């Protein structure tokens, strides 16, 4: 049975030829759903909801074009048209606010697309209000290899087949341009805002800034850089642990021992992952 990447290699030229000749948003939507989502990525039409009505507490109404699990698709005739994108972003903010009020624990992604260009967005949330949008790793399938197209869609559509672990697949899934990082960075910002005045957290941030001053010649006060370092430090610890444990253990109760370094000592590795500047999200006030 051919892999998804092999199917993409076979079907992509024909898909691009036809999608470029569709002259309406509806035609592009129908063709993309049946050919790209259905034929290549096995997304069944019955798993999609169309024209989903939305309404916020402030009575802003909308109608989401297509909903698949936690993904909101906003279809456009031309995703290179700046006005169309601006209009789409306004609509996505309404949809995000609706779903935040309806399902506050569920994380939604919005994608503005014309079937060729896919622009994914995540909401920036402050005090239970969607204040702005953050765009992540935009995809143009006419300029991207079948392998990278597969990795990109796997981030959102969740293919069941196993992905070979390579530096490229890790970067696509967890890199600083990935939706995973953008979502976690937003969560880290909200957490940091809640505990920034705690003595231990403040000390970690100040010590981190001091050490970077030695490297760069001036103190680093950029919180986004601190969040990046926190994310990357945590990710490395988790990946190394998965490798050492042969990926046999994924229990959430092991997260604390991994991040504080205790689990690595059990493998005979010391001074690799002791408590550092980036364990601040493990503050008891956050965990409780």
For each predicted feature, which ranges?
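Short N-terminal signal/transit or membrane-insertion segments
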Residues: 1-6, 49-53, 175, 224, ...
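Charged, often flexible domain-edge or linker segments that flank or initiate folded functional domains
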Residues: 69-80, 84, 93, 97-287
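Active-site metal-binding core of divalent-cation-utilizing nuclease and nuclease-like domains
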Residues: 40-69
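Charged, often low-complexity linker/regulatory segments
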Residues: 1-46, 58, 178, 182, ...
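Short hydrophobic/aromatic-rich motifs at helix boundaries and adjacent loops
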Residues: 4-7, 65, 208, 212
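Phosphate/oxyanion-binding active-site loops and adjacent basic polyanion-contact surfaces
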Residues: 24-30, 83-91, 231
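Aromatic-acidic/polar surface patches that form glycan- and anion
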Residues: 25-26, 62-64, 225-232
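A general structural-boundary detector
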Residues: 19-20, 53, 60, 82, ...
């Amino acid at each position: 049975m051919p892999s998804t990447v092999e199917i993409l290699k076979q079907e992509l030229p024909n898909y691009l030829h036809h999608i470029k000749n569709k002259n309406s948003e509806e035609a592009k939507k129908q063709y993309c759903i049946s050919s790209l989502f259905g034929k290549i990525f096995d997304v069944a039409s019955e798993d999609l909801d169309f024209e989903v009505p939305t309404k916020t507490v402030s009575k802003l109404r909308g109608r989401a074009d297509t909903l698949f699990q936690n993904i909101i698709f906003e279809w456009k005739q031309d995703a290179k048209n700046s006005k169309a994108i601006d209009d789409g972003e306004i609509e996505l903010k309404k949809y995000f606010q609706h779903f935040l009020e309806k399902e506050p624990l569920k994380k939604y992604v919005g994608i503005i697309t014309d079937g060729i260009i896919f622009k994914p967005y995540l909401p920036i949330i402050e005090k239970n209000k969607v204040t702005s949008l953050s765009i992540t790793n935009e995809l143009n399938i006419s300029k991207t290899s079948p392998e990278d197209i597969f990795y990109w869609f796997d981030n959102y559509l969740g293919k069941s087949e196993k992905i070979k672990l390579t530096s490229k697949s890790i970067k696509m899934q967890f890199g600083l341009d990935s939706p995973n990082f953008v979502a976690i960075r937003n969560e880290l910002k909200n957490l940091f805002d809640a505990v920034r005045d705690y003595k231990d957290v403040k000390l970690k941030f100040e010590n981190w800034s001091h050490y970077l001053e030695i490297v760069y010649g001036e103190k680093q006060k950029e919180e986004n850089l601190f969040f990046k370092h926190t994310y990357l430090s945590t990710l490395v610890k988790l990946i190394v642990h998965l490798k050492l444990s042969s990926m046999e253990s994924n229990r959430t109760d092991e997260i604390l021992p991994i991040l504080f370094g205790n689990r690595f000592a059990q493998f005979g590795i010391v001074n690799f992952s002791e408590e550092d500047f980036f364990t601040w999200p493990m503050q008891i006030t956050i965990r409780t």
